[in-house]
Amino acid sequence: MESFGARLHRVVGERGPLCVGIDPHPGLLERWGLDDDVRGLERFAGTVVEALGDRVAVVKPQSAFFERFGSRGVAVLESTIRQLRTAGSLVLLDVKRGDIGSTVAAYASAYLDPSSPLHVDAVTVSPYLGVGALAPMFELAAAQGGGVFVLALTSNPEGAAVQRARTADGRTVAQLVIDEISQLNAGARPLGSVGLVVGATIGQTGHELAAVNGPLLAPGLGAQGASAADLRVVFGSSLPAVLPTYSREVLAAGPDVVALRGAADRVLADCRAALTGS
């Protein structure tokens, strides 16, 4: 079975280094002329799939914006996942789950077991209960060719108080996470399947990312304030592993399908230039 890291490397090579979020928050639905209800949600998600599913490497639905409509919203999420995967995009579900024991194993099954209606290519997780507590996620991902992205240095300013705090051995909390994920990915080729979330807004990290040997998801671009040029400052020698992530900057171009594609093409060109220096 092809690993997630290998699939991601292949699809990014084919489609380019870009992840686009599906974040149907009320203000964006209104901007698109849609009602803030399940019908509006379904039309929004369907339009994004039509516009980008066959051309963007990774699409990242934010689960909360579907969950807020209850079971009908989750049904739309399930349908969106199926459509995206059929169109050839890798689906990264933004859920930021984190727990222990049988509970984290249940989360793993919900998102990474092929028999689940919410089965996706990868998920985001929180390491606050300890990176080791996420072992069921890592194990099922490895068994099923899935991926996991662990929060490390996030784009929100509140995160620094925890992530840059020092542990007993002098490392920051973020560095501890980085080191443990580096061990999980050791020896993987062409890329490990456990990635990190590192915000594009944070400037020079002061942390060593080159040894991670896994994908580095970079949110915070566009509406959150970072530009593609900031990627070189944040990631330095780790640029080849970076997966830039845009949401509102692309989605604001909707609901016109052609305009959405044009917005995605523009930010992809910016990302290529930033990551390659050309």
Curated annotation (Swiss-Prot):
Belongs to the OMP decarboxylase family. Type 2 subfamily. The active site is at residue 96. The keyword Lyase applies. Its EC number is 4.1.1.23. It catalyses: orotidine 5'-phosphate + H(+) = UMP + CO2. One of its GO terms (biological process) is 'de novo' UMP biosynthetic process. Pathway: Pyrimidine metabolism; UMP biosynthesis via de novo pathway; UMP from orotate: step 2/2. The keyword Cytoplasm does not apply. One of its GO terms (molecular function) is orotidine-5'-phosphate decarboxylase activity. Keywords: Decarboxylase, Lyase, Pyrimidine biosynthesis. It holds the Pfam family OMPdecase. NCBIfam families: pyrF_sub2. This is Orotidine 5'-phosphate decarboxylase.
